[in-house]
Amino acid sequence: MSVRKRIGVYPGTFDPITNGHFDIIQRATLVVDHLIVGVARNAGKGPLFSTDERVEMVRDELPHISTHGATVEVRAFDSLLMHFAVEMGAQVIIRGLRAVSDFEYEFQMAGMNHRLNPQVETLFLMASDRHQFISSRFVKEIGRLGGDIRPFVSPRVAKRLLSRFAQEMPLPADTTLPLQAAP
């Protein structure tokens, strides 16, 4: 008898992808055999990076994280999440929770997704304590205002962010923002 491959989808805008997102990806690979990181086009959110740039950022980081033997792929999508999950053959949607406020929203989404297709479960993973306060929105705000974003994103993502902010609003000539990983 063959064993069915467990496929999960971890959806998000990932604008930018943070260390908290990568923590969820690593931990999700403990419960699925194949994880699809679904990068939502989500133009309504007015993303800083294009969909292609966000997909590339996620792909660039995958070699640097442990996936516990599971395979991970990255795909963009612009359909209903449940349609994307079914199209990918997923049995589970992975969602990260940082706080009670996340739970309220995610609880409603899980209920709606269950109504759309009760065959696909939603699995919540609590954010690790060191990542509970990280959000893409906060990282962008900190970076735009010249704060140190190194504790929240990889060095490669930090470099992309700082480059984008410099294009939007050039920093004063005497401003130096370190790009090395935080100790």
From Swiss-Prot:
Its EC number is 2.7.7.3. ATP binds at T13, F14, H21, G96, L97, R98, E106, H131, Q132, F133, I134, S135, S136, R137. The keyword Nucleotide-binding applies. One of its GO terms (biological process) is coenzyme A biosynthetic process. Substrate binds at T13, K45, L81, R95. It catalyses: (R)-4'-phosphopantetheine + ATP + H(+) = 3'-dephospho-CoA + diphosphate. GO terms for molecular function: ATP binding; pantetheine-phosphate adenylyltransferase activity. Pathway: Cofactor biosynthesis; coenzyme A biosynthesis; CoA from (R)-pantothenate: step 4/5. Its cofactor is Mg(2+). Keywords: ATP-binding, Coenzyme A biosynthesis, Cytoplasm, Magnesium, Nucleotide-binding, Nucleotidyltransferase, Transferase. Pfam families: CTP_transf_like. It is an enzyme of class 2 (transferase). One of its GO terms (cellular component) is cytoplasm. InterPro entries: Cyt_trans-like, PPAT, Rossmann-like_a/b/a_fold. CDD domains: PPAT. PANTHER family: PHOSPHOPANTETHEINE ADENYLYLTRANSFERASE. Reversibly transfers an adenylyl group from ATP to 4'-phosphopantetheine, yielding dephospho-CoA (dPCoA) and pyrophosphate. Homohexamer. Belongs to the bacterial CoaD family. HAMAP family: PPAT_bact. This is Phosphopantetheine adenylyltransferase. It comes from Rhodospirillum centenum (strain ATCC 51521 / SW). The gene is coaD.
